[in-house]
Swiss-Prot record:
Keyword Transport found: yes
Organism expressing this protein natively: Bordetella bronchiseptica (strain ATCC BAA-588 / NCTC 13252 / RB50)
Gene symbol of the encoding locus: hmuV
GO CC, alphabetical: plasma membrane
EC number: 7.6.2.-
Protein name in the entry: Hemin import ATP-binding protein HmuV
UniProt keyword list: ATP-binding, Cell inner membrane, Cell membrane, Membrane, Nucleotide-binding, Translocase, Transport
Membrane topology classification: Peripheral membrane protein
Major subcellular location class: membrane
């Protein structure tokens, strides 16, 4: 069962944000969404998540139009990590991660506690479990929020049902080690757990290393879509980012690319 955007057009205040964009997120794949600032990446992710209604076009989860699903139904099928999660309450880290179980009231407290423990471990933040969320650094908060959506993903597991995870710039506050760990986890969720994962990143080389498919947006339109070798070309770097770049075979990772801006 795929999550598919078909010919999406979306505007805000009369200004076009997306124009005729089609994209498929399939089970078992990690799709990277790239583009310059203001290209429409977060808007496309929000539309795929069912959080924004397009002016025209549709988003389908299998045969179901996302517009026919309510918030609870959506939350039981896909998890979303926004670019800037808003949390104004002084909660403990475990409580924040436990919010991932909110769409599943049928879970008993013991099951929720196990979900939280598993998500904390998978996100590498078990050592933060007893801390207060507002006291954490920006990078620590980002990793805790990642644990929250991991808990949600684990809670939604049901035989025969594909789960989807959407991450909007999840590594923006992370150091290089934790960037790689988070993206490695995202790829494992796709390849090993069969999830469909969409991630917005600005680091082209991280996208080239971890993603199976890349979608490159430019001014609200899809400029390129396909495997990294087809998307990360000098011509695309010039047209989308306005930079001259060399695209080389990665010296230590077979089959991967390295993009070097001149």
């Amino acid at each position: 069962m795929t999550l598919q955007a078909r010919n999406l057009t979306l505007a805000r205040g009369g200004a076009p944000i997306l124009t005729d964009v089609s994209l498929t997120l399939a089970p078992g794949t990690l799709v990277g969404l790239l583009g310059a600032n203001g290209a429409g990446k977060s808007t496309l992710l929000a539309a795929l998540a069912g959080e924004l209604a397009p002016r025209s076009g549709q988003v389908f989860l299998g045969d179901a139009d996302l517009a026919t699903l309510n918030a609870r139904q959506l939350a039981r099928r896909r998890a979303v990590l926004p670019q800037k999660p808003s949390l104004s309450f002084d909660l403990g880290v475990s409580d924040v991660v436990g919010m991932g179980a909110y769409p599943f009231p049928e879970l008993d407290p013991a099951a929720v506690r196990q979900l939280v423990r598993d998500a904390l471990e998978q996100a590498g933040v078990t050592h933060l479990a007893q801390r207060r969320y507002p006291q954490l650094s920006g990078g620590e908060q980002q990793r805790v929020q990642f644990a929250r959506v991991l808990a949600q993903c684990h809670a939604m597991h049901a035989p025969g049902q594909t789960r989807y995870l959407m991450l909007d710039e999840p590594i923006s506050n992370l150091d290089p080690r934790h960037q790689m760990e988070l993206l490695a986890t995202a790829r494992a969720l796709a390849h090993e757990a069969g999830m469909g994962v969409l991630v917005i990143v600005h680091d082209i080389n991280q996208a080239a290393r971890w993603c199976d498919t890349l979608a490159l947006l430019a001014d609200g339109r899809l400029a390129a879509l396909g495997p990294p070798a087809d998307v990360l070309t000098p011509d695309h770097m010039r047209r989308v980012y306005g930079i001259e770049a060399d695209v080389l075979a990665h010296p230590t990772l077979p089959g991967r690319l390295l993009v070097l801006a001149r």
